[in-house]
Amino acid sequence: MSEQKQDVAATEEQQPVLQIQRIYVKDVSFEAPNLPHIFQQEWKPKLGFDLSTETTQVGDNLYEVVLNISVETTLEDSGDVAFICEVKQAGVFTISGLEDVQMAHCLTSQCPNMLFPYARELVSNLVNRGTFPALNLSPVNFDALFVEYMNRQQAENAEEKSEEEQTKH
């Protein structure tokens, strides 16, 4: 009986763990520098969108992940800035039982994927409060971004290795 309990405990220790501890807004900014005259122009927006993540280990198996979203909208004809919206949506996650690549995937894909709906809603709300037309950000495929990042890393490593071999000869 006690052997079964030990086996179960050992199995539970080996299981990957990903738990949300807290989700919060770390920083938010909304600027509409050309109000009110921007509303007198024809609304032909040009949208600029930037996305990045930051990860910090804050304790044993405890990580803060910050999803940074920046949206800048200008008018096509005049080039005037309609609005700039910046959101840092953050979360603290308990993560354990993962190897290096799995951990990197979790921190740069799974965690941001959980944070994105909160950030998207906040951006939409801020734009709405500025009385601009609705802005609904499309979903982001963080898995594809992670694969792209890993491929770039492998290509850079192969290039560095090739350069090292050429300098040795």
Swiss-Prot record:
Its Gene Ontology cellular component terms are: cytoplasm
Cellular localisation: Cytoplasm
Entry keyword annotation includes Cytoplasm: yes
Keywords assigned by UniProt? Answer: Chaperone, Cytoplasm, Protein transport, Translocation, Transport
| Keyword Cytoplasm (UniProt) | yes
Gene Ontology MF terms in the entry: unfolded protein binding
Q: Which Gene3D superfamilies match?
A: SecB-like
Q: Which segments does the entry list as coiled coil?
A: none
Q: Which CDD domains match?
A: Translocase_SecB
Q: Which GO terms describe its biological process?
A: protein folding; protein tetramerization; protein transport
Alphabetical list of Pfam families matching this protein: SecB (PF02556)
Q: Which InterPro entries match?
A: SecB (IPR003708), SecB-like_sf (IPR035958)
Q: Which family does it belong to?
A: Belongs to the SecB family.
Q: What is this protein called?
A: Protein-export protein SecB
> Origin organism of this chain?
Haemophilus influenzae (strain PittEE)
Gene coding for it: secB
